[in-house]
């Protein structure tokens, strides 16, 4: 049985704000098989966390394993994925549902909360995605934020 370990992290500068995701996929011996670093526009931190998980699960599917251990530093996501907390945000419900569909592909699934120090590689990738986003991407993210704020004034 082939097993994978998936570390995922999302970062947002502002909540919502410019956001990025980071993913590290390892085999059971700790060898890095894949890394993902992607700017995802203007999102909340929790949206970014779920999007990192989803992107990680999609990348992991390419490796074709029977078992996966997901390690996240977001207690909220861990509790929601385990069914211990309800998902109240309408922004997060479809993301959680998508993650569950992707997790169902595996015969064995583990979901663990880890301290930030054990998720540093994914965190670095998420922040690097924001840091290296083009000026156009960042401007678009800021413009979206300003448009939404102006809607509140009406």
Regions found by a protein language model. Give the residues of each.
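Intrinsically disordered, low-complexity regions
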Residues: 1-5, 31-34, 39, 61-64, ...
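RNase H catalytic domain
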Residues: 11-15, 54-126
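RNase H-like nuclease fold core
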Residues: 1-47, 51, 58-66
